[in-house]
């Protein structure tokens, strides 16, 4: 509970208003409920968990069912599929590998996968894979690619549409391969490296790539057209969209990324900063490693419209930031994520010590998520 003295404090809120009294826990709950309850009704979402990080402290809220058939409610321990929010874990793990001196973003991809002998891979660097700028790698790896030999065949036969760095085209097949190659020098699998280097140091004890048997009871059912679904296995799924987590762990993830000064492992601290560095500018958005950033303050339309698939999945000109700009505290840092039966959104403003996690067991339009998050955080200014 907040101390009463805190409720009387004043904080500067330059972006939305001049001054506002610090919010009480009840006021925060009211703000969140007024946005999330109608959202769930409009989008027919069975269950949601939301965390708000306000003045650096997390507040948790849950609604509805994690499993309709068995009448299991959503709790603070419920595991949700994060979808592409998993890419932020990939980016931080890659940043950690850079900080350890194991890889460089300027390294050619072929250094870590010499079997990629096709001419099209000459000139493509790890940076391009990590930031979707390799030249037009597709959004998804085809379903018929089921093993490493088929994966190599897929990449060997891919032909770029543009020169590396010309355009950004969002792609699981791009950042997914980055994640797989970034851990090669460690000698560990991607899952092992993620667990040892990121999840365990940050005490994310309920965040998984493979949900263990004893945690299955907390694994929510996702829903698509009213039917329960879980994500299907696929090549590079762990790297691109395969993480599952609870609202408590995701609040901790936001806190660590918002202010890494409390992270004890120096390479992880540096990795978090590298993931929020600015490598390319695409319109008013900056591409990090997994994370995407916009300058703060900003207008709601720029993030809401930018999250629409027509924009987010479009091939857009990329302007390289060279050298990359270090993380900027006055940023809206965010990532959307979806699987067949889940929809997630994470956003934070480091300068304001303010953030939000929204986890749902149904996928629903990204602009709706972003607008809801904006409305909540705007009122907490």
UniProtKB/Swiss-Prot annotation:
Q: Name one GO cellular component term.
A: outer membrane-bounded periplasmic space
**Family as reported in the entry's similarity comment:** Belongs to the class-C beta-lactamase family.
* Stored InterPro entries: Bact_CellWall_Synth/Modif (IPR050491), Beta-lactam-related (IPR001466), Beta-lactam/transpept-like (IPR012338), Beta-lactam_class-C_AS (IPR001586)
User: What is known about what this protein does?
Assistant: Class C beta-lactamase which confers resistance to penicillins and cephalosporins.
Task: Give the originating organism.
Answer: Klebsiella pneumoniae
Q: Where is the signal peptide?
A: 1-20
Listed GO molecular functions? beta-lactamase activity
Name under which the protein is recorded: Beta-lactamase CMY-4
* UniProt EC number: 3.5.2.6
* Gene of this entry: blaCMY-4
Pfam families tied to this protein: Beta-lactamase (PF00144)
Q: GO annotations under biological process? A: antibiotic catabolic process; response to antibiotic
Something else known: The class C beta-lactamase family has a specific amino-acid numbering system known as SANC, for structural alignment-based numbering of class C beta-lactamases, or else the simpler name structural position. A multiple sequence alignment was used to derive a consensus sequence and then the consensus was numbered taking into account insertions and deletions. This allows use of identical numbers, e.g. for active site residues, despite differences in protein length.
Q: Does the keyword Signal apply?
A: yes
Q: Which UniProt keywords apply?
A: Antibiotic resistance, Hydrolase, Plasmid, Signal
Q: Which reaction does it catalyse?
A: a beta-lactam + H2O = a substituted beta-amino acid
What are the binding positions for a beta-lactam in this chain?
Answer: 84, 140, 170, 172
Q: Which domain of life is it from?
A: Bacteria
Give the positions the UniProt entry annotates as the active site.
Answer: 84
């Amino acid at each position: 509970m907040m101390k009463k003295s805190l409720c009387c404090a004043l904080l500067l809120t330059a972006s939305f208003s001049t001054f506002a009294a610090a919010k009480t826990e009840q006021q925060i709950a009211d703000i969140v409920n007024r946005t999330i309850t109608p959202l769930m009704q409009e989008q027919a979402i069975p269950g949601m968990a939301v965390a708000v990080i306000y003045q650096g402290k997390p507040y948790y809220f849950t609604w509805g069912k994690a499993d309709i058939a068995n009448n299991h409610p959503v709790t603070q321990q419920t595991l949700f599929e994060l979808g592409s929010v998993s890419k932020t874990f990939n980016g931080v793990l890659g940043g950690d590998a850079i900080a350890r001196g194991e890889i460089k973003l300027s390294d050619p991809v072929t250094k870590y996968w010499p079997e990629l002998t096709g001419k099209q891979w000459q000139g493509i660097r790890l940076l391009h894979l990590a930031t979707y700028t390799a030249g037009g790698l597709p959004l998804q790896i085809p379903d018929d690619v089921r093993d490493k030999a088929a994966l190599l065949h897929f990449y060997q036969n891919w032909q770029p549409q543009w020169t590396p760095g010309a355009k950004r085209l969002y792609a699981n097949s791009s950042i997914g391969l980055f994640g797989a190659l970034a851990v090669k020098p460690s000698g560990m699998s991607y899952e092992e490296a993620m667990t040892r280097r990121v999840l365990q140091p940050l005490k994310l004890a309920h965040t998984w790539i493979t949900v263990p048997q004893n945690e299955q009871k907390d694994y929510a059912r996702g829903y698509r057209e009213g039917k329960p679904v879980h994500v299907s296995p696929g090549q590079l799924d762990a790297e691109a969209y395969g993480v599952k987590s609870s609202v408590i762990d995701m609040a901790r993830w936001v806190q660590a990324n918002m202010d890494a000064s409390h992270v004890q492992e120096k390479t992880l601290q540096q990795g978090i900063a590298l993931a929020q560095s600015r490598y390319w500018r695409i319109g008013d958005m900056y591409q990090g490693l997994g994370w995407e950033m916009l300058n703060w303050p900003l207008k709601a339309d720029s993030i809401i419209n930018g999250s629409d698939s027509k924009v987010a999945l479009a091939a857009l000109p990329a302007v390289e930031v060279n050298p990359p700009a270090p993380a900027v505290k006055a940023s809206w840092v965010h990532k959307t994520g979806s699987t067949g039966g889940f929809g997630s959104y994470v956003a934070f403003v480091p300068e304001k010590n303010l953030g939000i996690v929204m986890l749902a067991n149904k996928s629903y339009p990204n602009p709706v998520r972003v607008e809801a998050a904006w409305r909540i955080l705007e009122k907490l200014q």
